[in-house]
């Protein structure tokens, strides 16, 4: 979702004859993710509210971020994406004529977890996947869906769940994707 908006912007700037009729995102961190925010030090381990799996994800991602290209881990942070000078603001107008379907996963829940980070799909919260605080100037035509699913089969495997618990492997989720494409 994040990179596709940049590609759509370039197509528009180049006056390409190629027209994007719709955009569908699955678990895209429109407003960042707890993983990114933890990696750059904007939140501490308490954001996991004692959830052992999320604590492991946070610490492992932080350790692996050192091997990523410079800035890659920062691109999925609230600090980078939000606010008047954030990446989302730079994308204002790009999606004006494009219907956007936003799909979030709520497989993981926690009592007392901050709404910014909970529920989530193992990496991205429903709030971020639904772009709840992204201004209408950036995202004017949105439809949202939530499924009690993980981000991917990688996350499902990590928690010992069947692959069909992943958004990327669930036929109900994929039906929504197909409908969004067909309706564009």
Predicted regions and their residues:
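Hydrolases whose catalytic domains are alpha/beta-hydrolase-1, hotdog thioesterase
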Residues: 2-7
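Helical cap/lid subdomain of alpha/beta-hydrolase-fold lipid enzymes
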Residues: 9-184
């Amino acid at each position: 979702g994040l990179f596709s908006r940049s590609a759509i912007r370039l197509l528009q700037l180049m006056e390409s004859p190629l027209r994007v009729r719709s955009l569908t995102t699955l678990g895209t961190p429109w407003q960042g993710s707890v993983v990114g925010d933890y990696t750059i030090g904007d939140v501490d381990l308490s954001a996991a509210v004692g959830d052992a799996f999320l604590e492991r994800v946070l610490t492992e991602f932080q350790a692996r971020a050192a091997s990523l290209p410079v800035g890659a881990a920062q691109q999925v942070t609230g600090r980078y994406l939000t606010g008047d000078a954030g990446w989302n603001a730079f994308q204002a107008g790009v999606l004006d004529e494009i219907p956007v379907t936003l799909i979030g996963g709520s497989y993981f829940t926690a009592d007392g977890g901050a709404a910014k980070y909970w529920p989530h799909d193992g990496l991205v919260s429903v709030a971020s996947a639904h772009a709840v605080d992204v201004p209408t100037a950036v995202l004017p035509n949105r439809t949202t869906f939530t499924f009690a699913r993980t981000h991917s089969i990688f996350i499902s495997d990590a928690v010992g769940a069947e692959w069909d618990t992943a958004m990327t492997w669930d036929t109900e989720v994929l039906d929504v994707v197909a409908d969004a494409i067909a309706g564009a």
